């Protein structure tokens, strides 16, 4: 387990400001005109960690892929470039993000390559064992009962399928200090990995990478055959 994290120093604590609740709520579930703006910002701010997730997924051309919390849809569109013979689905419980992704990638939608769905990941609208690969980025903070969501992802993944969960953990002290606990439930990395195991996955690896000013954690897991 990596231990390369440093706590905030005294100087850091003086300048850290907590994200306003209104903005934090938009980060969880973008809505209205402000949500449209947040969607644009999020697309830029999360691109690097999404690229890392695609690398960790080890996509094959015929893979069927699920993104939980598909947001702007840009990552799923990139995945479609690799999984060129597969089908790809994204689900998001923000109507703003669902509309934005559907419009932004309407070409892929029209071709039947990608489908964006409006809904919640604790009740996924997909058949058992429908996907070869699945991933979720910056979603776990917003799951009131994370085991329910993870169990659903396990249900729709095929045996020997691969799942990658990306998040900022409680060990990232700056993230914890600046994001209100009323909206963000920020758990330790080890606790998240244990939840993934309890959902039925085998945890293959846990990684940490510095992405700009963010310290990202990645849990790589597989569904046993």
Regions found by a protein language model. Name each.
Residues 199-200, 208-225:
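Core SAM-dependent methyltransferase catalytic element
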Residues 122-133:
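A short acidic, Gly/Pro-enriched loop at the edge of an enzyme's catalytic core
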Residues 133-146:
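A short SAM/SAH-binding and catalytic strip from SAM-dependent methyltransferases
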Residues 147-159:
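A short glycine-rich, Lys/Arg-flanked "PGG" loop and its adjoining helix->strand segment in the class I
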Residues 44-63:
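Conserved alpha-helix/loop element of class I SAM-dependent methyltransferases that forms part
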Residues 62, 157-162:
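Short glycine-dipeptide loop
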Residues 162-191:
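Conserved class I S-adenosyl-L-methionine
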Residues 64-123:
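Class I SAM-dependent methyltransferase SAM/SAH-binding core
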């Amino acid at each position: 387990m990596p231990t390369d994290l440093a706590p905030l120093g005294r100087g850091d604590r003086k300048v850290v400001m907590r994200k306003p609740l209104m903005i934090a709520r938009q980060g969880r579930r973008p809505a209205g005109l402000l949500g449209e703006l947040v969607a644009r910002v999020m697309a830029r701010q999360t691109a690097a960690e999404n690229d890392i997730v695609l690398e960790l997924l080890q996509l094959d051309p015929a893979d069927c892929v699920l993104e939980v919390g598909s947001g702007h849809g840009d990552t799923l569109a990139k995945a479609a470039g690799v999984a060129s013979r597969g089908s790809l689905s994204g689900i998001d419980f923000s109507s703003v993000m669902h509309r934005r992704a559907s419009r932004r990638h309407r070409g892929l939608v029209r071709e039947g390559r990608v489908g964006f769905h409006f809904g919640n990941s604790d009740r996924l609208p997909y058949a058992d064992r429908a996907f070869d690969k699945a991933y979720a980025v910056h979603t776990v903070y917003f799951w009131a009962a994370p085991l329910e969501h993870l169990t659903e992802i396990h249900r729709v993944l095929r045996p020997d399928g691969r799942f990658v969960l990306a998040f900022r953990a409680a060990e990232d002290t700056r993230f914890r200090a600046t994001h209100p606990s009323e909206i963000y439930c920020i758990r330790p990395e080890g606790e998240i990995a244990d939840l993934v195991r309890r959902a039925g996955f085998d945890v293959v690896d846990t990684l940490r990478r510095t992405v700009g000013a963010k310290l990202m954690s990645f849990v790589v897991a597989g569904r046993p055959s």
